[in-house]
């Protein structure tokens, strides 16, 4: 008896019960048929594979990095300007909110809104937090870490979003 073995790389496109990009951070960009009916791809043929081109190149998912020296969040917000974004720190959390009112695009009228909340490590220096938006729409929130035993100064405050004219140096997914 022959059994078809699929490489794990294909599982995202082929898995009938694998979550689609429906709940990813695409901020109102269109959906594909397989986002609504993912089981169809596996019923056609076990070897049928949907295109991953857009998913790989334009995932829109945030990335959080925390190493020994710093804490960084990368978030794709290409449909928002700095005026549409609010970044604030409350206790041990950073909250990023984006909203733009209804405006016309190529397909009609659209409005977008998102809210993300991330827990800050306890040793991040909250007085030195910064946030910038690159020319290609990548929001970078970062803060240095301090040695243990030093007070990190937890308070509520807004972090201004500065605009950079160069593209982001964030890794592409």
Curated annotation (Swiss-Prot):
The modification N-acetylmethionine is found at residue 1. This is Alpha-crystallin A chain. Residues 1-63 are annotated as: Required for complex formation with BFSP1 and BFSP2. Keywords: Acetylation, Chaperone, Cytoplasm, Eye lens protein, Glycoprotein, Metal-binding, Methylation, Nucleus, Phosphoprotein, Zinc. The modification N6-acetyllysine is found at residues 70, 99. Transmembrane segments: none annotated. The modification Deamidated glutamine is found at residues 6, 50, 90. Heteromer composed of three CRYAA and one CRYAB subunits. Inter-subunit bridging via zinc ions enhances stability, which is crucial as there is no protein turn over in the lens. Can also form homodimers and homotetramers (dimers of dimers) which serve as the building blocks of homooligomers. Within homooligomers, the zinc-binding motif is created from residues of 3 different molecules. His-100 and Glu-102 from one molecule are ligands of the zinc ion, and His-107 and His-154 residues from additional molecules complete the site with tetrahedral coordination geometry. The keyword Chaperone applies. GO terms for cellular component: cytoplasm; nucleus. GO terms for molecular function: metal ion binding; structural constituent of eye lens; unfolded protein binding. Residues 52-162 form the sHSP domain. Glycans are attached at residue 162. InterPro entries: A-crystallin/Hsp20_dom, Alpha-crystallin/HSP_16, Alpha-crystallin/sHSP_animal, Alpha-crystallin_N, HSP20-like_chaperone. It comes from the Eukaryota. Zn(2+) 1 binds at residues 100, 102. Contributes to the transparency and refractive index of the lens. Acts as a chaperone, preventing aggregation of various proteins under a wide range of stress conditions. Required for the correct formation of lens intermediate filaments as part of a complex composed of BFSP1, BFSP2 and CRYAA. The modification Phosphoserine is found at residues 45, 122. PROSITE patterns: SHSP. Zn(2+) 3 binds at residue 154. The gene is CRYAA. One of its GO terms (biological process) is protein refolding. The lineage of its organism: Eukaryota, Metazoa, Chordata, Craniata, Vertebrata. Belongs to the small heat shock protein (HSP20) family.
């Amino acid at each position: 008896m022959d059994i078809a073995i699929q490489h794990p790389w294909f599982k995202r496109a082929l898995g009938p019960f694998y979550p689609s990009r429906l709940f990813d951070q695409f901020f109102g960009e269109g959906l594909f048929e397989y986002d609504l009916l993912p089981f169809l791809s596996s019923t056609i043929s076990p070897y049928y594979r949907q295109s991953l081109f857009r998913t790989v190149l334009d995932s829109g998912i945030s990335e959080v990095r925390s190493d020994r020296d710093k804490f960084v969040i990368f978030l794709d917000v290409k449909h928002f300007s700095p005026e549409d974004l609010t970044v604030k720190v409350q206790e041990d959390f950073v909250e990023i909110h984006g909203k733009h009112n209804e405006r016309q695009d190529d397909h009609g009228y659209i409005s977008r809104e998102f809210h993300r909340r991330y827990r800050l490590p306890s040793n991040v220096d909250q007085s030195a937090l910064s946030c910038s938006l690159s020319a290609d729409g990548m929001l970078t929130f970062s803060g240095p870490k301090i040695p243990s035993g030093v007070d990190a100064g937890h308070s509520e405050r807004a972090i201004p979003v500065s605009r950079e004219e160069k593209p982001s140096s964030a890794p592409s997914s």
